[in-house]
From Swiss-Prot:
Gene Ontology BP term (one): sporulation resulting in formation of a cellular spore
Functional description taken from the UniProt entry: An anti-sigma-G factor, prevents premature activation of sigma-G factor in the forespore; overexpression leads to 1000-fold reduction in spore formation, spore formation stops after engulfment. Overexpression also inhibits sigma-G transcription activation activity. When both Gin and sigma-G are expressed in E.coli Gin inhibits sigma-G, strongly suggesting Gin inhibits by direct physical interaction.
Recorded consequence of changing residue 33 to A: No longer inhibits or interacts with sigma-G
Protein name in UniProt: Anti-sigma-G factor Gin
Chain positions recorded as Zn(2+) binding sites: 11, 14, 30, 33
Names of the cofactor(s): Zn(2+)
Domain of life of the native organism: Bacteria
Pfam families for the chain: Gin
MF terms in GO: metal ion binding
Organism: Bacillus subtilis (strain 168)
Amino acid sequence: MDETVKLNHTCVICDQEKNRGIHLYTKFICLDCERKVISTSTSDPDYAFYVKKLKSIHTPPLYS
């Protein structure tokens, strides 16, 4: 029996469950959204949407 467990994470941009992408601090960005963010021009209307979504990613506090 070959049982593969795939963990899905909720993308902070599209709010969909995906299993491929990157983690930034405590948030997840799916591969599709990562590619869209990288290829979007600053003059594109979608750029403001991506910036707003990415601003929800905060650096976790550092405790000593």
